[in-house]
A protein has these predicted regions:
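Charged, often flexible domain-edge or linker segments that flank or initiate folded functional domains
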Residues: 1-137, 186-317, 420-424, 442, ...
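Generic, well-ordered alpha-helical scaffold segments in large soluble proteins
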Residues: 95, 104, 108, 127, ...
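Class I S-adenosyl-L-methionine
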Residues: 110-118, 122-208, 515-516, 530, ...
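Short acidic/His/Gly/Ser-rich catalytic and metal-binding motifs that mark active-site loops
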Residues: 175-176, 297, 334-336, 430-432
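SAM-dependent methyltransferase catalytic-core segment centered on the flexible catalytic loop
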Residues: 228-247, 251, 295-393, 398-405, ...
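Sequence-level detector for compositionally biased, low-complexity segments
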Residues: 285, 337-339, 364, 383-541
Length: 541
């Protein structure tokens, strides 16, 4: 064995070499700090894009102004009548910045040129004088290059998902924080998604003798986010490969209200289908950019040119007989400050249904929380499946024992045949020992509320009240332990359910005793001690 040769490096040269190597590693692999720096630039550039678009719209009779007005009309029809001009400008700014990102992430898929919403927006941008907006492109070129570098060579779908979610997270939290706050955006852990999908499939078979894969079973995820539910439905094999093309083209439906999330969902679903079937790339026809809650509200006015193809998809979905609804509804419950111009929207028909059911049966004085997004989602889905079907959501679990929710709990019993509630706990609006007992938050830092998976089964032939099946995941469990338990059950059929007997007050757990009613009321006609009362603390009067 000869002597090993050494290398004589100049220390300064060695430093340069080390820096170059590190730069290459960062370029190829990316790191969180690096992406957050880009996000700050993106936020500023998005603002500048919005200012430029506003300036272009100040020419009242220009072609650009006419095209934008048409677009705004379309957005209001597809999303919500209360969408402002500023909201539409923000959407266009998002589109300008993200189009090249998707082109970089999914080279060879021609996604942005085939997606109906992307096409409509690109038409507006072409008219609005793209030159005026292209000045920022050079600044962003480095960012797009980093996305291309990071995505190149990643064929593993989980790796690509990770990049997309990181991008989405960083982009939203920094560039559009108000939107994150308004919509309560959080991601659904795959373990929970798989549990919900397998439970829906098992419940369909047990109660209706069909499966998710069967023809004429239409499946809808009304709040698809980045498309995790449809993607996992494609990936898990619940739909056999020979049945997948038909299901994908005709019976799988997804809605999303946030433009960027809609783009990501469409790409994710399309990529999953392409990968699993090995067929040519094919745009997913079942995804709609829309406000799900707005879909059943009365429509006014004529058809327009704003987003025609998207509107057509929305009409087609409304005509479908949807029997399975799964997903993770938005969590937003209002806002901290009434002046931040970010109020949650109103839906007269949907809210009227809540007033006639959940609120009508509630004994609470303040019923505002019955109009939280996730409660609206239950009302909307219960009505959408008509007289028969399945709803399975993961939501805030506060309704299980909240005082205001007594009317909601009563209505679930009245409208369904079976109600399954898997309480994952995690209420971090508690402290000390109680907080430790509640355990980890399954949504990570995305949510501090307790979380529950609820499976609702509605049958035409059912008489009487629903059977209530309940399972508490247990005390002192970490997030990872909870997800492991959910995963090990596989579906609702393996969960050791306990049957609950609600009392006359519609308490399901932690039932109150009747002793309290023996006390003399301070204010409760006609035997009250005091004749008048007001909500003084809330009204400051």
């Amino acid at each position: 064995g000869g002597e090993q040769l050494g290398f004589a490096f100049d220390p300064e040269e060695l430093g340069k070499w080390q820096d170059a190597m590190f730069a290459k590693i960062v370029t190829k692999c990316g790191n969180r700090r690096y992406w957050e720096d880009w996000a700050k630039d993106i936020a500023e550039i998005a603002d500048r894009h919005q200012m430029r678009i506003r300036a272009l719209l100040e020419k009242p009779y220009s072609k650009g102004k006419k095209a934008f007005d048409e677009f705004l009309k379309g957005v209001r029809k597809n999303l919500n009548p209360s969408v402002s001009q500023n909201d539409a400008i923000e959407m266009l700014a998002q589109h300008i910045i993200t189009k090249p990102v998707f082109d970089a992430l999914f080279e060879g898929y021609a996604f942005t040129s085939k997606n109906p919403v992307s096409q409509s927006m690109q038409k507006i941008m072409d008219i609005l004088d793209a030159q005026a907006l292209d000045k920022e492109h050079e600044t962003l070129e480095g960012f797009y290059a980093s996305v291309r570098e990071r995505a190149s060579g990643i064929t593993d779908p989980k790796g690509r998902q990770k990049i997309i979610i990181e991008l989405y997270d960083k982009f939203f939290k920094t560039a559009f924080p108000r939107m994150v706050e308004r919509l309560g955006i959080v991601y659904t852990p795959v373990e929970i998604v798989d549990f919900i999908l397998h439970s829906a499939d098992a419940a369909l078979q047990a109660h209706f003798g069909t499966r998710l894969a069967d023809q004429n079973v239409h499946i809808l995820d009304p709040f698809t986010g980045t498309g995790t539910f449809p993607v996992r439905l494609i990936e898990t094999g619940l739909i056999p490969p020979e049945k997948l093309p038909y299901k994908y083209r005709h019976e799988l439906h997804a809605n999303e209200i946030v433009l960027l999330a809609y783009y990501i969902a469409a790409i994710n679903i399309e990529e999953a289908f392409h990968r699993v079937t090995g067929l040519e790339y094919e745009p997913f026809p079942g995804i709609v950019l829309t406000d799900t809650f707005q879909m059943n509200e009365p429509q006014t006015g004529d058809l327009y040119e704003g987003l025609p193809e998207n509107h057509k998809r929305s009409d087609e979905q409304k005509a479908r007989d949807i029997r399975v609804i799964v997903g993770n509804p938005p969590y937003s419950v209002g806002q901290d400050n009434a002046n931040d111009n970010n109020q949650n929207l109103k839906y007269p028909r949907l809210d009227g249904r809540i007033a006639a059911t959940y609120a009508a049966h509630s004994t609470a004085t303040n019923k505002n929380s019955l109009y939280d997004s996730y409660i609206r989602a239950f009302r909307w889905a219960s009505d959408r499946i008509k007289d028969e079907g399945i709803v399975c959501f993961v939501t805030n679990g506060g309704w299980i024992d909240g005082n205001t929710m007594d009317g909601f709990r009563k209505t679930l019993q009245d409208e369904f045949a079976d109600v399954y509630v898997f309480n994952l706990r995690g209420n971090q609006r508690t402290s000390g020992e109680l907080s430790r007992k509640e355990g980890g938050k399954v949504f990570g830092s995305g949510s501090r509320t307790p979380v529950a998976i609820t499976l609702l089964i509605k049958r035409k032939d059912h008489q009487g009240k629903a059977a209530i099946h309940y399972h508490d995941i247990g005390d002192y469990l970490s997030r990872e332990q909870k997800l492991e338990i959910v995963s090990s059950f596989g579906s609702y059929q393996q969960v050791p359910w306990q049957t609950l007997e609600p009392n006359e007050y519609h308490d399901w757990i932690n039932q109150r005793s009747g002793d309290f009613n023996a006390f003399v009321p301070l204010n409760d006609e006609p035997d009250a001690i005091f004749a008048f009362r007001s909500r003084g603390v809330e009204t400051s009067r």
